[in-house]
Structure formats: C-alpha cells, structure tokens
Amino acid sequence: IKNKCHKCGGSGVVKGDEVVEVKIPAGVDNMSKIRVSREGDAGTNGGPAGDLYVVLHVKASDYFKREGNDVYSRLDITPAQAALGDEIVVRTLDGEQKITVQAGVQSGNSIKIKGAGVPYIQRPSQRGDHIVVVAVKTPTKLTEEERNLYKKLYEIQNNKKATQQSSIMDKVKGVFQ
C-alpha cells in the first residue's frame, strides 16, 4: 500500500472505545457471562467482528442471601410474637408482603414464600422461593412494667412445671405401693 491511512496505518482498524448496550436478564448470578455477537474486536483482513463477552459482578445484598434461585432473609421477632403468633410485613424482591408467623414458632424455624425468589434464566416465568428465617430476640432493656409481666409469667410457668413434676412423682410412687 503506497498511500497508507494516517489513522489506521493501512490496517483498516482504528482503536477506540464504544458504548454497547447489553440487556441483562433477571436471575443472573455472580460471574455469569453474556455474549454479545459481533461487538468484539474487528476481524482481520476485513473479516467480521468478534464477539464481546461481558462478565457480570453481582453486588451482594445486605438484606438478602442468595442460594441458587432461592433467597433468604432474617426476621427478628419478640418472644410475645413467637408465643402468640403475628402477621408481619417483610421485604421481598418484589416489595413488601404480609406473612403469618404461627404461634409457638422457634428461633431457626423458617417461613417459605413460594415463587418469590430469583427467576430461572431459562424459564423466567418460574422463580425460586423466598425463605424467611425467624430469630426470636430476647429483650435486654426492660421497662418496670415489662419486668413485672415477665416475673408473673415466670411464676406461672414454674408453678405449671412443679405441678407436672409432682404428678409424675405421684404416679411413680403409686407403682411402688
């Protein structure tokens, strides 16, 4: 080539930056790769451009934990809510949703919200589940009224235990008489 282009030096390729819009589907996970056809480097000798591969880095949430297509969150409740049950509004991927906490729930029990997890990439109409893990939080600072109520509850529960234990002992004594 006698008269080489001063921009490309006769190669037909000029280095530069280009903004490419990439559609990211719901449900992608960290380190997922998306291929964008013919948006990569220019081909050699006038050939077609290569493909652009975008590697996704998904930021972790402070509230949700993801395992596959299921998401987990924690729900702190009071001992009274655990004993009596309650209706509580929780945060989900789609906004707020009311769930029912059954009476007698224990720390570590979970409540499943079916279909409220992350969409499956191959089947976007289907989703994983949202699992709400219950944590019963014992109060550390009590008002005088709360302290008195807890004392009364303590006495009631201890009397019930003492009654149960004495009835068991009476049965054992009856066997030996």
Where do the language-model regions lie?
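Non-catalytic interaction modules of co-chaperones and other macromolecular assembly/maintenance factors
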Residues: I1-Q177
